Amino acid sequence: MIPPFDPDRKRVPMTVIAVEYTYSDATAAARDEIRPDHRGWLAGLIDAGTVLSTGPFADGSGALILVSAADAETARELFRTDPFQQAGLVDSARFTEWTPVMGAFTDR
């Protein structure tokens, strides 16, 4: 994985993958039960510099996770280890390479 920052805390080029999860209302209770494991897994990836930002959609329909990875397939392989995915709680997962042009993930 490419770290989002160098040791001097300057921005460096990276490949960002936007991971979009969708959830079913039918799995809400199970997600509540597994959520501590899911968030612990994400926290480890944040500490490693792999997950850049994450959070649920306000309507509860899913979540967006921004990931620093070599490519979408690398991210897809990593996310197979997510406790939510392992428990079958993700209806669909979309992995799309995203090119930051301006803002928090760029020099502008």
Placement of each model-derived feature along the sequence:
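Conserved, structured core segments of small domains
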Residues: 2-108
